[in-house]
Amino acid sequence: MPAAHPTPRFDTFYRHTELVQLLQAYADARPDLVDLRVLGKSHEGRDIALVVVTNTATGDDDDKPAIWVDGNIHAGELTASTACLYWLHQLVAGHGSGPDANPQITQLLDTRVVYLCPRLNPDGAELALADKPRFIRSSTRPYPYDEQPVDGLTVEDIDGDGRVLQMRLPDPNGSWKSHPDAPHLLIPRG
């Protein structure tokens, strides 16, 4: 009988290191079903984990029809990572002949492969899960990364409290001024 597999917590969002450790625990407990691979590196150098789920006794993953499932494409989409963990747990628990066995899951993993990438954007997720969270839509890589900075536009947390609360700070000597007919617009100071 295979070793007991881990049970993820569904009342929390995992930080990157904890998530990879959990995925490795599945691979260690069920090497006949779960293979943890590295899909690539993030902008900040974190591994992008890929979990390959299939019954290796019935063939290699390269030789079976497949389905791809991913989560956390955008920084704050943490629930998608949890959904991937839930599905991984159901697949592993449901395969075989144990108390939670499900014949449909067994047939699926005997004849198919499931590629699960629970967190495509580990850098953005880490920002969202930080002690002082920062919520961005995408990744920490600047976008567009080849664009020159705009004079007068400073995209940063000025006071270091982890929040950007004000878009405009008046500066009588700055490069920009309010438009005379539409004060909500800024125009270059001439």
Residue ranges, per PLM feature:
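M14 metallocarboxypeptidase catalytic domain recognition
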Residues: 1-190
